[in-house]
Amino acid sequence: MNRIMLLAKIHRATVTEADLHYEGSCGIDEDLLDAANMREFEKIELYNINNGNRFSTYIIKAVRGSGIISLNGAAARKAHVGDHLIICTYGSVPDAEVNNHVPKIVLVGDNNSIKEIKKI
């Protein structure tokens, strides 16, 4: 049997852009993607710290070093520029590996810069 487990989390990312008329997705600075081991087109769950909205979409790459977190399409209705988000990926982990599974956590500071990377 497998369990769905947290793989990675970007914590307290600040929304920098929201474009309702874009096709969809969430643009994330490539530095953050690399730090969290997240991939373009991967499904993500997002939790808006400001208003409690929870929603899912997929990742597209934003310019490396830009600090961009952009919500596009329908996701743009779930948060405003300046809102703080928790961005998570989950995956299937075999029961035999669950006790050794360690998610990667990226804590974000000002301008969506990487403040700390840790494993919990």
Swiss-Prot record:
It is found in: Cytoplasm. It is an enzyme of class 4 (lyase). Transmembrane segments: none annotated. This is Aspartate 1-decarboxylase. The gene is panD. The active site is at residues 25, 58. Pathway: Cofactor biosynthesis; (R)-pantothenate biosynthesis; beta-alanine from L-aspartate: step 1/1. Gene3D superfamilies: 2.40.40.20. Heterooctamer of four alpha and four beta subunits. Belongs to the PanD family. Its EC number is 4.1.1.11. It comes from Polynucleobacter asymbioticus (strain DSM 18221 / CIP 109841 / QLW-P1DMWA-1). The modification Pyruvic acid (Ser) is found at residue 25. GO terms for molecular function: aspartate 1-decarboxylase activity.
